[in-house]
């Protein structure tokens, strides 16, 4: 009986791990970038499973404090999405990035494209 429970647990764990979907990340602003002015930067992370996700916004390599983050919600396909946002002053040459780590994996940086 114990062996059956162990095997069933291992099967469940294997199936859960096989459903891992890495996140898709988009970084954008609420308004077109106007250098020297404040804009809302939004990091939209979606299509990920399981819901273990860490994210932060950085400006020039320094974490931006007091960002707002939504709770993870699930889409029709049972994969998750969430956003993190803040208002930030953007000057020419600034590098604004969203740093995301999913399911304990190393962090990846996603840069805001500023034209």
From Swiss-Prot:
BP-aspect Gene Ontology terms: antigen processing and presentation of peptide antigen via MHC class I; immune response
- SMART domains given for it? IGc1 (SM00407)
Source species, domain of life: Eukaryota
Keywords of the record, alphabetical order, are: Immunity, Immunoglobulin domain, MHC I, Secreted, Signal
Tell me which residues make up the Ig-like C1-type domain: 22-113
Signal peptide residues on this chain, from the entry's feature table: 1-16
Cellular component GO terms, alphabetically? extracellular region; MHC class I protein complex
Localisation: Secreted
Q: Name one Pfam family in it.
A: C1-set
Explain the purpose of this protein.
Component of the class I major histocompatibility complex (MHC). Involved in the presentation of peptide antigens to the immune system.
| Assembly mode | Heterodimer of an alpha chain and a beta chain. Beta-2-microglobulin is the beta-chain of major histocompatibility complex class I molecules.
Family from the record: Belongs to the beta-2-microglobulin family.
What name goes with this protein?
A: Beta-2-microglobulin
- State the organism named in the record: Xenopus laevis
The gene that this protein is the product of is: b2m
């Amino acid at each position: 009986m114990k062996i059956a429970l162990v095997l069933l647990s291992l099967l469940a764990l294997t199936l859960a791990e096989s459903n891992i979907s890495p996140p898709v990340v988009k970084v954008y602003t609420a308004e077109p970038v106007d250098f020297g002015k404040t804009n809302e930067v939004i990091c939209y992370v979606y299509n990920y499973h399981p819901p273990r996700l860490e994210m932060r916004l950085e400006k020039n390599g320094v974490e931006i404090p007091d960002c707002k983050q939504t709770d993870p919600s699930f889409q029709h396909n049972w994969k998750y999405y969430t956003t993190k946002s803040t208002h930030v002053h953007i000057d020419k040459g600034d590098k604004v990035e969203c740093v995301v780590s999913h399911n304990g994996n190393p962090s990846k940086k996603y840069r805001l494209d500023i034209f």
